[in-house]
Every structure is written in structure tokens, then in C-alpha cells.
Amino acid sequence: MDCKVVSLNEKDQFIPKIKSSDPVITGLFQYDAAQQTSFEKRMSKENNGREAALANVIREYMSDLKLSSEQELNIQHLANGSKVVIGGQQAGLFGGPLYTFHKIFSIITLSKELTDTHKQQVVPVFWIAGEDHDFDEVNHTFVYNENHGSLHKVKYHTMEMPETTVSRYYPDKAELKQTLKTMFIHMKETVHTQGLLEICDRIIDQYDSWTDMFKALLHETFKAYGVLFIDAQFEPLRKMEAPMFKKILKKHQLLDDAFRATQQRTQNQGLNAMIQTDTNVHLFLHDENMRQLVSYDGKHFKLNKTDKTYIKEEIINIAENQPELFSNNVVTRPLMEEWLFNTVAFVGGPSEIKYWAELKDVFELFDVEMPIVMPRLRITYLNDRIEKLLSKYNIPLEKVLVDGVEGERSKFIREQASHQFIEKVEGMIEQQRRLNKDLLDEVAGNQNNINLVNKNNEIHIQQYDYLLKRYLLNIERENDISMKQFREIQETLHPMGGLQERIWNPLQILNDFGTDVFKPSTYPPLSYTFDHIIIKP
């Protein structure tokens, strides 16, 4: 597999500004992610003393998996005080989208580089956001149908949308297998298809909860790298978090004030507010099989889906004795994560790192230092066919990744059309506009006639526009093969107007290039970069 790094002219300049150590952006974080001294400081930080307990919890969470020797060793390293690089993601259907895998590769790559540079073991940890309850965000994925040259949405259907956390959801296995079958119908048959399907079927048979199936697929893919997994909703982990839940409840108003103040500062720097929440407690409580947002009305803590209320002593008592009922929101999850782990760096997606930029004062309030916040690696897979099509139509890869192919497609259509025809129609449009101006001069002061002339002009312009559009549409139809090839490029490299990794599913890559494609023996060694990585399997 070949690997190269390309620099894109990105519309969103947040990550390029991190790369260049822009003082406005770096001021939103505790550390400058582009400076080596930041890593030296984090590597020398004193540990929090929770590492041995965490190692035991992670071992228990992964006890239903057959651990690799690398994972066994990393659990021991963690217990002995090794620091971590961490990142997380919701449990998407069949492991999707692709950037979930890329986030894990980011964690692996950075932890290895830090281990090599500082001669201290750094452990890669992936945090599964099993506490999330928005099932609509994880119950679907997309598959590319090569025969049609188009993407298809594949969705796991339920009679009722679950309102509990994803970790507490147990999907119907027959329905999930039907969803998997639908996905494979759209994918082309390769020598890898049957083996991949058997792996997925086995995972569905062997595991019961939504997040356990997700964990099993990730483990199958990344165990050789020594990645450790933990679910935010895992009950023994929640018991470790009880002291912090109590602190959050006691300081909830100060926490909310700190968050709002930091968010306002980011807006004053010209950034859009990323975290949208009305709560002033920033925790959820599981009650009546629903994950319910907690808020405080000045007297009571109340839940948003039932009429239950609690006084402070009651809700703190729940946090102490039943912490597994609590879960964090977007504000408190980073805080809890960093309170638990001895983190060198947190790896996040483009939106995630903007969330963290709104939390600096929250970390300071709880005397927890914000780690280095690193943008994850961004990766696109370029196969031989698409590379040949880019060459055929002389389209720069970097341009497609940012803008898609619509501009190049329109240019191609016009190149196939009669230039004289287009020029004459456009000339007629310009002539009509001049005529309209002359006629308006003739009827100046008479509003009825002005309206009449303008309406006449509008009709003529519409007719000429229609003529030109229909003519170009006919050219499209005459070049149907080329149009299909432009669609192939678009759906592969810029699907739904964005990067491939945001839409495509990892199973597509595994099916096309083999079930070992992401393994160390096959996948190219990566170097950490803020630019874009192109991999040619």
C-alpha cells in the first residue's frame, strides 16, 4: 500500500491555525499542539493514582474478548503508570463511518511516536461513547454501489426508537443480520466478501448489546496494535467516577458559569458556538428506562422526560450509591475522561476539538489540566480506477477533496458542446437585456408599462435560460458514460459534499481490499500530520 500526504486549501481554517500555532486559537487550549515542548511537559506530569484501578476496569471490560499479547502488555503498562493517548466515538452501525477507524489509527500513531521519542511507554486507549442515547445518529451507514455509481443509505430499523443509552440497547439479531445482508447486496462481490460476512455474522451471534458488537469489530481490527477499549457506560467505570459526579452536582452552577464564559470568549474571537445545551447541570440520569437530562430550577434537580424532582442531598446520594445511573453530557465528558486517565493528548475530530475550545475554564474550576488537544488524522483511500479517471479528465485530486467534481463536470459538458451555439444564446440574452433597458427608458414614469416591460423581459430571459439548460442537458445525455464516471469520482472522493471518511463505512474497504487491510502487516506506517493522507491500497 502506498501512502502520501497532501496539503488541502481548507475552507475551515481552524486546524491549519492549530498547525501554525495561531495565538488566537492556541489561547483557547492549555497547550499548543504544534509544539514539541507541550508533549515534553505532559509526559513529565505526575500521575493521578487511578491507573491501577483503571487497568483492572479495562481488563474486566475486555474480558469477553480474546486479548492479544500487545493488549495484555498495554494493560500491564497502564497499571504500572504509563500515560495514554485517548479518543472516542459513538458506536456506529458496522463500525462506521470510516473516520472512527482513522481516529483509532491517530491514537495508535501518536502513542507510538511518543513512546519512541520519550522512551516511555504510552498506551493507546479508545473510549466508546456508549452513554449516548441519540440512536438516530448510530443506526445507519452508507454503502457505495459500484454498478450504479451511487451511495445508498443502509439503516437498522426498530419498531420503537430506544430512549436509553446505546450501551443498554440490545438489537434484534435477525433484523441486524438483514441490515448487514442489505449492505452486502450493494457491495461488489470480491474474494474477501464471504470471509468478511462470516466475521460480521459471528460477532452478531456472539454479542448481545449494540456497543459490545461495535467493540468486537474494533477489537478484531486493531488488537494487534495493542489498543485498549473502554465503554463510558461500563458500570465498574461509573463506580470509579462517583466522586467526580458528586463534585459536579455540588458545583453545577459554577461549572455552567465557567462553560458559558469560555464559550462567550470563543465567540468574541469570531468562532461559532459549538455546544448547544440548555442544561445548567450537564449530567443525565437514567430513570424509567430513559436517559434524562438533569436541570436545576433553584430548588430542585429535575428530569426532562418525567416529573421527578430531587433535592441536592437526594441526588448526591444517588451519585454516591448508584453512579451507574449517571452519564455525562458534551461538557462534562471531557472533564471526566481527563480526571480518570493520565492523558498526554486527546485526539478528536474537527468538530470535537472546537467543543474542547469552549471548556478551558471548566477544567480549571475542577483543577484538572486540559491535555494536548490534537486533530485526528484525516485519510482518503484512492483506488486504481478512480486514479485513472482523475488522470483521464485531468482533475487534480486535491481539488476534488475540497470542492467535489461539479465544476469540472460542468466544464467538461461545455467543452463537448458547440461553442457557437452557446455564444449565440448568451449573446441573445445580453441583447435582450439591452433591449429591456431601452424599453424601460421609453416608459419611464409609467409604472404599469414598467411592470409590463419587466415581465416581458423576465419571460424572454427564462426562455433563453431554458434553451441553454436543455441544450446542455442533451449534451450530458450524449456523454452518459463520462457523466457516470464523474459521479464515480464524486461518490468516492467527495460523497454528499464532504470527505470520504465521513460517509463511507469500513466494511467497504475491508470488502474491496481484504480483511487484513487495516492490520500492521498490510496498512502503511503513518506519521502524525495535520495535513491530509492519501492511501492507495
From Swiss-Prot:
Under InterPro entries, the record lists: Bacillithiol_biosynth_BshC, CC_BshC, Rossmann-like_BshC
Show the Pfam families listed in the entry.
CC_BshC, Rossmann-like_BshC
Q: Where are the transmembrane segments?
A: none
What domain of life does the UniProt record list for this protein's source? Bacteria
For this UniProt record, the keywords arranged alphabetically read as follows: Coiled coil, Ligase
Q: Which GO terms describe its molecular function?
A: ligase activity
**Coiled-coil parts of chain:** 422-450
Q: What is its EC number?
A: 6.-.-.-
Entry annotated with the keyword Coiled coil = yes
Query: What is the uppermost EC class here?
Result: ligase
Q: Which family does it belong to?
A: Belongs to the BshC family.
Q: So what does this one do?
A: Involved in bacillithiol (BSH) biosynthesis. May catalyze the last step of the pathway, the addition of cysteine to glucosamine malate (GlcN-Mal) to generate BSH.
Annotated NCBIfam families: thiol_BshC
Q: Give the protein name, as stated in the record.
A: Putative cysteine ligase BshC
Organism of this sequence: Staphylococcus aureus (strain Newman)
Instruction: Tell me the organism's taxonomic lineage.
Output: Bacteria, Bacillati, Bacillota, Bacilli, Bacillales
